[in-house]
Amino acid sequence: QDNPGSVELFGGKSKRELGLMRTRVGYVPDSSGAYQSLSAVENLQIRCSEWGLDANREIPRVLSLVGLDVEEKKSSFIAALGMKRRLDIATALLGDTDLLIFDEPANGLDPLRIESIWALIGRLNREQGKTMLISSHDLDELASVATSCVFIHDGELLKMESMDVIRDEAPSLKEYYRRLMKAVSL
């Protein structure tokens, strides 16, 4: 049976309140939304202009947060997928958002870039106080930054659990997931 459910974000429940809250939420898609022919700065200038943000203040701040302040001077266009991913995260941070939503943040990256992106996500949480909602199939990396997990299968919420409980019940997040899926299929 369908259940439309409800959403509450930063204390807001109505459509109007939720619409106003969108400025506090940044989204990082699984494939880059950056204009490949433009530099990181040019991409961010476009977003600042669209969203009415002070580019002179925001761009240096977000580039520094994601470690692109040096990289952006190297090229007039964005070629490397790791740089695109950092730029996508910088874009999501524009306006000093409180909640970041990631869809497969390390999708398509090589092992070193994967490690780097997950380290960045953890640092943004610890040092900047950003709340993260992360959709990922990379359970080992996810376990390194998560404080709690929500398990969804075929559109159905299976379980929500803290990482402390998960660590008490299984040697790894992957093993916890295996056990959960085995129980569901019975």
Q: What is each model feature region?
A:
Residues 45, 56-71:
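Conserved ABC ATPase "signature" region
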Residues 2-13, 20-21:
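Conserved ABC transporter NBD signature motif
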Residues 115-127:
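Helical segment within the ABC ATPase nucleotide-binding domain
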Residues 100-103:
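Catalytic Walker B motif of ABC-type/P-loop ATPase nucleotide-binding domains
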Residues 89:
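Hydrophobic anchor residue at the start of the ABC signature
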